[in-house]
């Protein structure tokens, strides 16, 4: 009986120390390790309990059932394995946090990137139809946050028709659709029209996850062709060996 108690106590303290270590690294509570033995050295963590973070405690996410974690982890890892360790180091991404019902200021969101903390939080229950593409959309925000000089929004905006204007912020707009347009006219999705940075992220996510659509549409849409070339050219400035 004493031995059993000692084992239980040791497991408790190990879990506590592990949780404290993770918190000290990325400042998110209630996380545990899901997988750290990965080919590109990404560390996958999951929410053991709900957590609230942010300067105004305005970011919330909830824990998931194991079967959901296991299912979505396979999808997420397969997509993030497209990035090698060297590229991830350059863009400053190391930790992937898995949870569900992720929101910021009460608005549900697919992911929250934090370039400074090398972290990307992913809502594993977000729209299953677009889930894989959204992963790369959020990765682009990490890239963009670290290389603003390459992804200049004024230069990007000039690629559009002269009469087009983005909104002030992504949440200021009702343009939230992620379905791919049948007629593009410079944009892959409705959400692309919200802000310049979201447009870039949408273009990047299509380049990585849907090469056939990109090739087909850029042959017919000169604006989209320029946007795709802009993204590719500047990604290669970060890593000349990057494979699209």
Language-model segments: residues:
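Classical Sec-dependent N-terminal signal peptides that target proteins to the secretory pathway
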Residues: 1-20
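An N-terminal domain-start capping segment
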Residues: 20-23, 80-83, 153
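Auxiliary, metal-adjacent structural segments of Zn-dependent hydrolase domains
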Residues: 53-115
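Non-catalytic architectural context of zinc metalloproteases
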Residues: 20-70, 98-101, 168-181, 197-199, ...
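Active-site-flanking segments in enzyme catalytic domains
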Residues: 92-244
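Hydrophobic, Leu/Ile/Phe/Ala-enriched alpha-helical segments that form helix-helix packing faces
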Residues: 12, 76-87, 143, 208, ...
């Amino acid at each position: 009986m004493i031995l059993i108690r000692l084992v239980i106590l040791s497991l408790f303290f190990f879990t506590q120390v592990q949780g404290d270590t993770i918190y000290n690294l990325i400042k998110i509570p209630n996380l545990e390790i899901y997988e750290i033995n990965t080919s590109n050295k990404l560390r996958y963590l999951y929410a053991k309990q709900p957590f609230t973070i942010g300067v105004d405690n305005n970011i919330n996410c909830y824990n998931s059932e194991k079967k959901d974690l296991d299912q979505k982890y396979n999808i997420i890892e397969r997509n993030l394995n497209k990035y090698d360790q060297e590229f991830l180091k350059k863009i400053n991404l190391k930790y992937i946090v898995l949870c569900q019902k992720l929101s910021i200021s009460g608005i549900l969101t697919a992911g929250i990137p934090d370039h400074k903390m090398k972290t990307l939080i992913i809502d594993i229950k977000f729209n299953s139809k677009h889930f894989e593409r959204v992963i790369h959309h959020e990765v682009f925000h990490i890239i963009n946050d670290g290389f603003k000089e390459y992804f200049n929004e004024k230069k990007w905006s000039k690629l559009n028709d002269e009469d087009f204007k983005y909104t002030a912020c992504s949440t200021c707009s009702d343009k939230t659709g992620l379905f791919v347009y049948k007629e593009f006219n410079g944009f892959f999705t409705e959400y692309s029209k919200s802000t310049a940075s979201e447009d870039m992220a949408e273009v990047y996510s299509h380049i990585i996850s849907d090469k056939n659509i990109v090739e087909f549409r850029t042959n017919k849409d000169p604006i989209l062709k320029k946007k795709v070339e802009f993204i590719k050219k500047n990604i290669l400035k970060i890593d000349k060996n990057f494979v699209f």
